[in-house]
Structure formats: C-alpha cells, structure tokens
A protein has these predicted regions:
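Histidine-centered divalent-metal-coordination microenvironment in nucleic-acid enzymes
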Residues: 28, 51-92, 101, 110-114
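Catalytic "initiation/cleavage/transfer" segments centered on a nucleophilic residue
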Residues: 2-27, 32-41, 89-169
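Flexible, charged surface loops at secondary-structure boundaries
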Residues: 20-23, 45-47, 67-68
Length: 169
C-alpha cells in the first residue's frame, strides 16, 4: 500500500521485516554424536515433520588438513514459515544440535548432506540418508538432468542389447 508519509512507509517496512526476520520454511543444524542424547533420532521422528539426516560425516577434513569431529547434518522442512526462536530452537535444544542455518534451497542443502556437488569433499552414500515425516531424499535431490541421463542410459541399453519390443505379462 503506498504511503504519502515516507516515515510511515519506513516504519511499516521495518515492522514487516522484523516479523519476517528469522522465519523460513527450512532449517539446518549439526549434531555431534558424543553430545547428543541417545534418543535424538526418536525425538525427530516424534515431531512428524519432514526431516533428512545425513550419514555420519566421519571423513571430513578441515582446511588445515586435520579431521573434523564426526557429525550429522540435519535438515528440517516445514510447509509454512516458522520462527526460529520460538518454534525451532526448542527442537534443536532437545536433540543437542549445534548452530543453525536458515536454508534457502532444500534441494541444495539435501544434496550437501552427501556432498553430491562437492567432489573435492569426502563422499557419503545417499542410501544412508535418514528420511522422516514423509521427506523424500531422492525426490528432493533429483535434478532435471538426472532424468535425461537415465533415459539416455535406457536407450543405450536397448540399442546395445538389440531390444526391439517387449511383452508385458
């Protein structure tokens, strides 16, 4: 809504930004096994929200060359924006999480769980990603180019094996 009074417009924008600050649909954190409660995975499952948990990152190396402490990356995904301080921090506290990250791209962060786009980093198996609350790791991480590559592989297989037709039972 346009304002004639520029000060009122600035105040309105400031209130709007303050309300939105710290609110997003996707949040990430790190969990160190030695400082997390034994049942931290169960606590996440009991939330009934979409969560992805990386495989244990136990092969990561710091820039100095020394190994990083083993840790998990956790991605929480919600259907609507949530406030970090009042809604997300209590969850992170209950699982012994360290730090927070507001995630703009669920796909990008989900791919980071296994370092799919970082070949210089230790690689982790996507099969080991824990999916909770209806989160679909493969559905989130699949890129349009993956479909093209799959179709190309199928066509190569058909050609190499001289398959001309098939019969469905």
């Amino acid at each position: 809504m346009p304002y004639k009074d520029k000060d009122k417009e600035k105040e309105s924008k400031a209130r709007y930004e303050a309300k939105r600050s710290g609110r997003t649909r996707n949040f990430a954190t790190v969990v160190y096994p030695e400082s997390a409660p034994e049942d931290w995975i169960n606590k996440l499952e009991e939330l009934h929200v979409s969560v992805l948990v990386s495989p244990l990152h136990d092969k990561d190396i710091n820039p100095s060359g020394e190994p990083k402490k083993p840790h998990y990356h956790v991605l929480l995904m919600f259907e609507s924006p949530k406030d970090f301080e009042t809604q997300i921090q209590p969850i992170f506290d209950s699982i012994g999480a360290v730090g927070r990250e507001l995630v703009n791209s669920a796909r990008g962060y989900a791919r980071y769980l296994c370092h799919l786009d970082n070949p210089e980093k230790a690689q982790y198996s996507p099969v080991e990603v824990r999916q909770m609350g209806g989160a679909d790791y493969y559905g989130i991480t699949q890129l349009p180019t993956d479909d093209v590559r799959l179709i190309s592989e199928i066509m190569d297989f058909i050609e190499a094996n001289e398959i001309f037709s098939f019969f469905e039972f």
